[in-house]
Amino acid sequence: MTDANHPVTDLVILAGGQARRMQGLNKLLQCFDKQIQLLKISQHFRGKVQQQWISSNRDHRIYQHVVPHIRSFKDEETGFLGPLMGMKSAWRHVSADYVLFVPCDVTYLPKSVLKKLHQSLQQHPEAEVAYVEINGAALYPFCLLKRSSLPTLSAQIEQGELSLKKCFKLMHAQAVKFRKHALIFHSINSFDELQQYKQLNVLI
């Protein structure tokens, strides 16, 4: 079952990085908040999306063991080209015309995030993407994209322009703002940050 209050949407978890700053560890399989990230994200959006996917170049069997109903795919092109490539590749697999992309390292998942992203796109018909902003910081990979964004994604990649910020500007991107008190890290970018995040959670 999916939420009937918004158009049919698929979820894609972006986990296609090289994990160089994580000492090779797959962030999606780490525990940030006493729960494996994959489970945390999957359970948060269960019943709100049609199908859940993972954009990743590794560990596909492990993902399916953790969440049996989840599906995964690799980047269309090799070379770890970043989230833009994961987004472009997704449209070859999903059937929905809207995709909610969630980075694997995000620490805070607002309860109403999907609803508010859809509302933003409905209020701004010219926009092809709405992204999350937490405590004033833009999380461009945490976004809702329309299928009509594919030509722009493809063109930017062909030109070697892999910046989400620049790409989204071409799509008339809308920011949806959230606030979270005492949030030190909105995402985890390194092994050291993960250790700090866990220590702070014990203290808070």
Question: What do the predicted segments below correspond to?
Answer:
Residues 2-140, 147-161, 166-185, 191-192, ...:
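Nucleotide and nucleotide-moiety/phosphate-recognizing core
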